[in-house]
Amino acid sequence: MRKPMKIAALLLAACLACLGLTGCHGDRGLSAFSMPDSFDESRDYEITFWAKNDTNKNQVAIYEQSIEDFEALYPGIHVNLRLYTDYGKIYNDVITNIATGTTPNVCITYPDHIATYLTGSNCVAPLDALFADEKYGFGGSELRYDGPDAEEMIPQFLQECAFGGAHYAIPYMRSTEACYVNKTYVEALGYQVPDVLTWDFVWEVSEAATAKNADGTYRVNGQNVLIPFLYKSTDNMMIQLLAQAGAGYSTASGDIQLFNDTTRGILKTVAQHTKSGAFSTFKISGYPANFLNAGQCIFAVDSTAGSTWMGSDAPLVDIDREKLVQFETEVRMIPQLDPENPKMISQGPSVCVFNKDDPQEVLASWMFAQYLLTNEVQIAYAQTEGYVPVTAKAQNSAAYQDYLAREGEDNEAHYAVKLQASKLLLEHTGDTFVTAVFNGSASLRNAAGQLIEDTTKATRRKQTVDDAFLDSLYSEMTSLYRLDQVSAGGGKADLGPLPGTAKALLGTLAAAWALIGLYLLWDRRKRK
């Protein structure tokens, strides 16, 4: 072979190597997980656990203690913890690691994300066989810890982890959204906080709060800054409003119904109250708790898992304490369209187990994941925020009931706002719902929130939000999130943005081909 052809062949080989590394969004073609007859304790196992904490050192300590206690029970299983503060970063890193065959063993995640992970062949282990195993399943005879039996799992929470005919996760914690209300300001405006907030009430009070003094300060707080109604997660806002209105969002099979007339009406209402200064969002203005605690917000909607940041006496604050304003805080369900039939979202982290070539490694991973359902872990972690344990075993335990009974005893572990947020979900679990999970549901959720964000931004920029604007916005969201490619039944469309590593490898591939072409052209001219 002539020298130029040898060099070209080497460059081509490099290209093919790069192509192999990029994969097809990580389709490694693992064999389906098969449950071993028993756990091989003669071996050592090293498993990785990717977890999220809410910038809360108590949560980190619980993860570390859980690992230490589990390893004491199973000396041959070593758990390596990697902490994140953002679910989106976990999602992106998992996608990247699917492409390179280096996923973690156990991961805190959301079902919407798992639906995308499943586009890799047998990438996530289905858990039904593990649930039912007599030795190592729920309440298994060979387990060295006291975990929940199958009937002690809260059915609704467990069902949230099932899609495509199988369970691909177990619930870890559950929360919902709550409206944290500055009762002092509501009453100063001449209103009383009802037991169940309605959207009409919140909009009316928020508009009343925009009144100003002659010097430009707001009458209700005497400050230059006030956002009466501030929403943290606008995807949840849109989803819950559609559910309360009985309007479409998506079907279980993945048919998208978001872009309807009810959505159009919601966005026009958002524009109306944004224009008056009564409404804004976290992405645009900032963290609701900061505004609430500074006396610059009246209705702050955030997760019950953020309750320790809410209120004048909150144990966690993200502003200078001298900026705190004293007021009475009330915790309520999110605003409702029909107070007699409330609807609110169920959310919170779940745990999935990734498939591996070695079934014993998967079983070891499952045993650790299931350990996170023990009372010791469930109760301890639930106490860090307004979370609720996902097992009846933990919820009904004397330790957890004692914790709930001590509401307001102090402003740390028993902070009143936090416990009221937990009780809100415990009392209204039957009023919660989840959206359908399919490949593309994560993108649909993002689009739902972005509709509100872009409408709010446009209004603040003095744009007119009319039907023509909304038609254009619908088209933009469909294109941006590739919603026209999401197929009913959860096909291969909409795998989310390609990870940066894969983009880099594809760039290398293109550069290598270009070098081949340039080299061959140079060689041809040289020989002439």
Model-derived features: where do they sit?
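Long, aromatic- and glycine/proline-rich binding clefts that accommodate carbohydrate-like moieties
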Residues: 329-336, 382-456
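Extracytoplasmic/periplasmic solute-binding protein
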Residues: 159-172, 177, 200-256, 297
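Conserved C-terminal helix/tail region of periplasmic/extracytoplasmic solute-binding proteins
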Residues: 416-528
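Extracytoplasmic/periplasmic substrate-recognition and gating elements
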Residues: 272-274, 278-279, 315-394
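Glycine-centered hinge/linker elements that transmit conformational signals in sensory
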Residues: 205-207, 252-283, 329-330, 334
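C-terminal motif of bacterial Sec signal peptides marking the signal peptidase cleavage site
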Residues: 22-23
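Hinge/lid segment of periplasmic solute-binding proteins
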Residues: 39, 111-176, 218-219, 320-335
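Early extracytoplasmic/lumenal segment of secretory-pathway proteins
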Residues: 44-49, 53-115, 290
